[in-house]
UniProtKB/Swiss-Prot annotation:
It is a multi-pass membrane protein. The gene is swnT. Belongs to the amino acid-polyamine-organocation (APC) superfamily. Amino acid/choline transporter (ACT) (TC 2.A.3.4) family. This is Swainsonine transporter swnT. One of its GO terms (cellular component) is membrane. The keyword ATP-binding does not apply.
Length: 498
């Protein structure tokens, strides 16, 4: 059944006329597809920050910045990415305030683009957004087992991790989080609870690191550049920003809750800006707690657990701090499942997928969620997991495109706004003419920089296991989306809800 002529009832329920396959061609029935708007600004922050997860993410990506310049890359890189994150959040806030819709980026493009290119650009943006969400979901699914098995390695140095172990846990997490995202009633409650757990866990880690550290990093060492990548310092710095960049990613999550939160034109921008405030505050404290207290460390392994063990001097303490980190990463996968499914559901309402009649359905009580979109997105994530089992290098290249695809999906509507002229844009309540323009330029400039330097290998002297295939994957994704457009979407894809 496909949704048609949606209208808002007095109680906030969305009622849609649908073509019924049971009652015969041409007949219509009325079904209730959504009964409430359960999210508040706080719960939207919870689910948005639950994916961004800045402080926890910094612990996971410590090893990516150390070879590119050491502490300065991590510290200054974090500040730079916080500025980019604020610019991105401001840009998205202006767009969602003007055009509140769960489709987010692709709806903005359809609304703003010249009529001749509207459908094609909108569809490309929709698919870019969804593939990015799938790639990021796969990354989160794998982060849990890979980092969980570091506990085993810490306790038993002879343990050898095998890819099949991560694959099994990957798929189990995918199934469990998909099921957990099925119930609309619990989503805002869980997101608020997880936000509290996140704040308490991060606070406990920071306090423990300062309390247990026996050595400290001198000011000289804190700002000493140690670049072993083989690249010039400037190039290495830009490549090394990748880790910090992930900690300010996925900011569009809250925008896809536009039909599940009252007054989305004002509440979602609040959620976006507060997400950046929380991310910056918690992330800065975590970075200082680690870099100030780590001191000299004589090991090539700069994984989060190793650093915690080095600072605390206790395996038990390190593991005790690492377990809540793993839980919060697991929780972020649950938030990503919600994000993926809302995107797939919204795109399906425009007949963007071959199975759109199923993906566009909202299941009745006790779910009130797009179950088929959840399952479809989870299957996409599962397929990424199968790729990991076949080739870790191919998997890493694929998920690495996630952040670049995100920026691409943000940049397309932003470029269109600038092309038309910001003064001509029918903006919403969240609108800052000069600040917004600066935010647009900063985000677009960084998108271009990231697109170039994130395609570089980490080390200048490349060995087969370290080849960066991101550029090749981006080309394949472009070919895939183009093929889908000409084979299916050009005929079927139509945006009917603006």
């Amino acid at each position: 059944m496909s949704l048609r002529n949606d209208e808002q009832t007095e109680k906030g329920a969305v009622v849609g006329k649908v073509d019924s396959q049971l009652s015969g061609p041409g007949q219509e029935e009325i079904i209730q597809v959504q009964t409430q708007k359960p999210f508040t600004t706080l719960s939207a922050i919870g689910i948005g920050y639950g994916v961004t997860n800045t402080a926890v993410g910094l612990l996971l990506v410590l090893g990516t910045g150390i070879p590119m310049g050491g502490s300065p890359v991590i510290f200054w890189g974090f500040l730079a990415m916080a500025a980019v994150g604020l610019a991105t959040a401001t840009t998205l806030s202006e767009l969602i305030s003007a055009i509140p819709h769960p489709g987010g980026q692709y709806i903005w493009v359809h609304k703003i683009a010249p009529e001749r290119y509207r459908r094609g650009l909108s569809y490309a943006t929709a698919m870019i957004s969804w593939i990015a969400a799938i790639a990021i979901g796969a990354s989160g699914n794998l982060a849990v087992p890979v980092n969980a098995f570091t506990i085993v390695t810490l306790l038993n140095p002879n343990f050898v991790y095998q890819r099949w172990m991560g694959f099994v846990v990957f798929q189990l997490i995918n199934i469990v989080t998909c099921f957990g995202a099925c119930f609309e009633y619990f989503l805002p409650k869980i997101s608020k609870a997880l936000l509290l757990v996140n704040v308490l866990s991060v606070s406990a880690i920071i306090i423990t690191l300062f309390a247990t550290a026996k050595t400290h990093t001198s000011a000289k060492d804190f700002f000493k550049v140690v670049n072993v990548s083989g690249w010039p310092n400037g190039v290495a710095f830009l490549i090394g920003l990748n880790g910090s960049n992930w900690c300010f990613s996925c900011l569009d999550v809250a925008t896809h809750l536009a039909e599940e939160i009252p007054s989305p034109s004002t509440n979602i921008p609040k959620a976006l800006i507060w997400t950046i405030v929380i991310a910056f505050s918690s992330g800065l404290l975590m970075i200082l707690a680690v870099l100030v207290n780590v001191g000299p460390i004589n090991t090539p392994d700069y994984s989060g657990l190793t650093v915690l063990h080095h600072i605390t001097g206790s395996k038990a303490a390190a593991i005790g701090l690492w377990v809540p980190v793993l839980f919060l990463v697991f929780a972020s996968v649950w938030s990503i499942q919600t994000w993926q499914s809302r995107l797939a559901w919204s795109i399906s309402r425009e007949s963007g997928f071959p199975l759109h009649r199923h993906f566009s359905k909202i299941f009745p009580a006790p779910f009130y969620t797009p179950i088929w979109s959840l399952i479809g997105s989870a299957i996409g994530t599962a397929l990424f997991g199968c790729l990991y089992l076949a080739s870790e290098l191919a998997f890493n290249s694929l998920i690495a495109t996630g952040i670049l695809l995100q920026y691409a999906s943000y940049s397309i509507p932003t470029i269109l706004v600038l092309y038309r002229g910001r003064s001509k844009f029918q903006h919403g309540p969240f609108w800052y003419p000069k600040l917004g323009f600066m935010a647009n330029i900063v985000m677009l400039a960084w998108t271009l920089v990231a697109l170039i330097f994130y395609c570089f290998p980490v080390y200048s002297e490349v060995i087969p296991s370290q080849v960066n295939y991101v550029s090749a994957v981006l080309i394949l994704i472009a070919i895939l989306i183009t093929s889908l457009w000409f084979l299916y979407a050009k005929k079927h894809y139509h945006v009917v809800e603006i």
